[in-house]
């Protein structure tokens, strides 16, 4: 019999239900989590034995959305879900980041977490639900997991923090922050903000962590009732004699190597020391394990770097704790791009371009939460040559997608609104060198490239990566961390913003005990670094250029009456296609009658505007037009009088005398003056050549006949 065990609780404005014991009973653990009709099914499978020689922790997190959750069938050719979307990849990373540091060092058994969205309420984003589910499933599994964790989304509306805002509330919020942590510590923060202060951001982190304690309490209650026995796993005992011998052989040499400021030279020297130490030890005792020697050397390397920083000595590259590496800022480096910049900070460098397009270039996203159009695209590329390596080049990996999204968050708050700047904008960051904080270099480069392209951003933005080294008695916050400091430190803390406030904040914390005081120090130190970088950037370009690039399309906007839209489009799009070909422009019409004409040539745009005005002009009864015969029928002739409008000249209105045969008087393509006699309620136009002939010269010039309108 199926005996589900259920835990239900109120979480802000939502009711959360945790259920286990019903499904996937062969998995190590499985939980169905629902939050107001958004339901995510999360499973955990852990292998009891580690693979021989496994040198890292093989944790895999897969988050997948099923279209049936929203009552839809996939729109792909095969009518089934395919490769993960960018959103699914980002949510997988969001789940992975806070749970990974909670597994003990030395645990290398394979673990897979799969979160499947099976029902979705468009007002409740599944990402928080999936994070809660992953935490609950891991806590139930018996794996050596030092959780559970809680997760919360925090908004900022009307100067108040809002717990887990709905999708509608989030559209009005100045903040979208996700925070995850254990009972006593914040582990992960991911956010974007509309220029909020350091205190407001820190307050949101603390608020979210306080509120999510109810999640942790309820997961613990579920584990008490349904949890599996804890795995009897213990880390392998450290060979103290070997560790002492390695310290004696390598400590002073590693300390000297970490005074070499150039990255490649330092890496080469460290590799030599490790190789020589390992060879010497194996020569002394062939029974020693090379992998164990490697692990102990890595631990020694970490201790050498950390202890120097904690003693207040200069960092690896000789800087003090709050110093920024040397900056080199250049704009307009690529002649034919719409905007470009080369941003260099020490050994980290980004070549960033900005490209302007029309609304047609925007990305249409058919997501589980509904369809949306994205007119600001940010793509981050990390080729292997940037770190002096060879490797595969192809589709973006999870890391590239995640870094691109973080950089996009850093710039999004200063981008102009669509009605003020009707362009689709694509920013691409090519990381050409990397030694720490390439995503924040991308933010700086993007700001520069956008200004170089003439995009009227509200303010310049810059990003900085902070680090932390902490022991029981002391802590040091580092500005502008190197790759080694990120790897060997206790926290990776990235902040982007303008002079006015923060636009993006990302935190990944590897240890417990990060207090509010430490986060406050890091945020304040990051502000000083950000302002320093902005000062250097402003020397290269102080604001957006006065005009967009000569190579970018210029978009001209006009307004037409809604009931004239069909005239401009024409039957089956015939009129708008003809206009596009005739004028050499791109024309887009919105439902409210807004017409956007894009052209690289101003004269072509003016011609297109004139033609649209002709098509949409009202026909005046009694006015004489110069028209062109487009069709001849037994009872008269149809004459185009401009702008795709056509009227009928009845056979009785061709001449003063009786007309037996229309073709005796009119030929196809013949230009004739016509007078408008009537426009009926259905828009049909009655014309007369006979009455026009009694007048003097035609009052309206002929225009080329356009395809028939609907």
Curated annotation (Swiss-Prot):
Known catalytic reactions: RNA(n+1) + phosphate = RNA(n) + a ribonucleoside 5'-diphosphate
Pfam families, A to Z: KH_1, PNPase, RNase_PH, RNase_PH_C, S1
Signal peptide: none
Location of the S1 motif domain: 622-690
Positions contributing to Mg(2+) binding: 486, 492
Compositional bias (Low complexity): 694-710
Disordered, as annotated region: 690-710
SUPFAM superfamilies the UniProt entry points to: Eukaryotic type KH-domain (KH-domain type I), Nucleic acid-binding proteins, Polynucleotide phosphorylase/guanosine pentaphosphate synthase (PNPase/GPSI), domain 3, Ribonuclease PH domain 2-like, Ribosomal protein S5 domain 2-like
GO biological process terms, semicolon-separated: mRNA catabolic process; RNA processing
Subcellular location: Cytoplasm
Xref: InterPro entries: ExoRNase_PH_dom1, ExoRNase_PH_dom2, ExoRNase_PH_dom2_sf, KH_dom, KH_dom_type_1, KH_dom_type_1_sf, NA-bd_OB-fold, PNPase
Keywords from the named record: Cytoplasm, Magnesium, Metal-binding, Nucleotidyltransferase, RNA-binding, Transferase
Domain KH span(s) in chain numbering: 553-612
Cofactor entry: Mg(2+)
CDD domains (alphabetical): KH-I_PNPase (cd02393), RNase_PH_PNPase_1 (cd11363), RNase_PH_PNPase_2 (cd11364), S1_PNPase (cd04472)
EC number: 2.7.7.8
Record-level GO cellular component terms: cytosol
GO molecular function, one term: 3'-5'-RNA exonuclease activity
Function: Involved in mRNA degradation. Catalyzes the phosphorolysis of single-stranded polyribonucleotides processively in the 3'- to 5'-direction.
PANTHER family per record: POLYRIBONUCLEOTIDE NUCLEOTIDYLTRANSFERASE (PTHR11252), POLYRIBONUCLEOTIDE NUCLEOTIDYLTRANSFERASE 1, MITOCHONDRIAL (PTHR11252:SF0)
Quaternary assembly: Component of the RNA degradosome, which is a multiprotein complex involved in RNA processing and mRNA degradation.
Family: Belongs to the polyribonucleotide nucleotidyltransferase family.
Protein name: Polyribonucleotide nucleotidyltransferase
Species assigned in the record: Erwinia tasmaniensis (strain DSM 17950 / CFBP 7177 / CIP 109463 / NCPPB 4357 / Et1/99)
């Amino acid at each position: 019999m199926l005996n589900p065990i259920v835990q239900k609780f109120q979480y802000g404005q939502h009711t959360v239900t945790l259920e286990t014991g019903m499904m996937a009973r062969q998995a190590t653990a499985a939980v169905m989590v629902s939050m107001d009709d958004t339901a995510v099914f999360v499973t955990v499978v852990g292998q009891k034995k580690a693979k021989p020689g496994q040198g890292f922790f093989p944790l895999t997190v897969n988050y997948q959305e099923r279209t049936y959750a929203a009552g839809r069938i996939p729109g792909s050719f095969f009518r089934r879900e395919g490769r993960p979307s960018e959103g699914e990849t980002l949510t997988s990373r969001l789940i992975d980041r806070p749970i990974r540091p909670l597994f003990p060092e030395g645990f290398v058994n394979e673990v897979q977490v799969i979160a499947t969205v099976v029902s979705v309420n468009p007002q409740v984003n599944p990402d928080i639900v999936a994070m809660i589910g992953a935490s609950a499933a891991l806590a139930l599994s018996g794996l050596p997991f030092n959780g559970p964790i809680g997760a919360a989304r925090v908004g900022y509306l009307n100067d108040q923090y809002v717990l887990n805002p709905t999708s509608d509330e989030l559209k009005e919020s100045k903040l979208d922050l996700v925070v995850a942590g254990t009972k006593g510590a914040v582990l992960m923060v991911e956010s974007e903000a509309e220029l909020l202060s350091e205190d407001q951001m820190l307050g949101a982190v603390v608020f979210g962590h306080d509120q999510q304690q109810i999640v942790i309490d309820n997961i613990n209650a579920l584990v008490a009732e349904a949890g599996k026995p804890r795995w009897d796993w213990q880390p392998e005992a450290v060979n103290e004699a070997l560790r002492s011998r390695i310290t004696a052989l390598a400590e002073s040499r590693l300390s000297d190597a970490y005074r070499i400021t150039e990255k490649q030279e330092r890496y080469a020297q460290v590799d030599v020391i490790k190789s020589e130490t390992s060879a010497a030890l194996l020569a002394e005792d062939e029974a020693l394990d090379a992998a164990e020697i490697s692990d102990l050397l890595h631990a020694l390397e970490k201790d050498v770097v950390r202890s120097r920083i904690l003693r207040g000595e200069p960092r690896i590259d000789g800087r003090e704790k709050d110093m920024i590496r040397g900056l080199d800022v250049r704009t307009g480096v690529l002649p034919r791009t719409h905007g470009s910049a080369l941003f260099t900070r020490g050994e980290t460098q980004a070549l960033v371009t900005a490209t302007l397009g029309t609304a047609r270039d925007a990305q249409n996203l058919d997501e589980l939460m509904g369809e949306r159009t994205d007119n600001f695209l940010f793509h981050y590329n990390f080729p292997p040559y940037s770190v002096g390596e060879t490797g595969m080049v192809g589709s973006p990996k999870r890391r590239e997608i995640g870094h691109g999204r973080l950089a996009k968050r850093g710039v999004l708050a200063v981008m102009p609104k669509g009605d003020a700047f009707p362009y689709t904008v694509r920013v691409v960051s090519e990381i050409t060198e990397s030694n720490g904080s390439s995503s924040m270099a991308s933010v700086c480069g993007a700001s520069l490239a956008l200004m170089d392209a003439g995009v009227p951003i509200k303010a310049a933005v810059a990003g900085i990566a902070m680090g932390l080294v902490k022991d029981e008695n002391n802590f040091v916050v580092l500005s502008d961390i190197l790759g080694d400091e990120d790897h060997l430190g206790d926290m990776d803390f990235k902040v982007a913003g303008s002079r006015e406030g923060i636009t993006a904040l990302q935190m990944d914390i590897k240890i417990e005990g990060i207090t509010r005081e430490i986060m406050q120090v890091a945020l304040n130190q990051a502000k000083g670094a950000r302002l320093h970088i902005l000062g250097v950037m402003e020397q290269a370009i102080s604001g957006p250029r006065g005009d967009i690039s000569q190579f970018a399309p210029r978009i001209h906007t006009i307004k037409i009456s809604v009931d004239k839209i069909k005239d401009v489009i024409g039957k089956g799009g015939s009129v708008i296609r003809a206009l596009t070909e005739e004028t050499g422009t791109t024309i887009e019409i919105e439902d409210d009658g807004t017409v956007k004409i894009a052209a690289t040539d101003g004269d072509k745009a003016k011609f297109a505007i004139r033609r649209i005005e002709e098509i949409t002009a009202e026909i005046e009864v009694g006015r004489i037009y110069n028209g062109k015969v487009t069709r001849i029928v037994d009872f008269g002739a149809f004459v185009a009088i401009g702008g795709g409008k056509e009227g009928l000249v009845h056979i009785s209105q061709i001449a003063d005398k009786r007309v037996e045969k229309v073709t005796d008087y009119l030929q196809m393509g013949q230009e004739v003056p016509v007078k408008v006699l009537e426009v009926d309620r259905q828009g049909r136009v009655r014309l007369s050549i006979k009455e026009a002939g009694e007048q003097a010269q035609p009052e309206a010039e002929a225009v080329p006949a356009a395809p028939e309108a609907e």
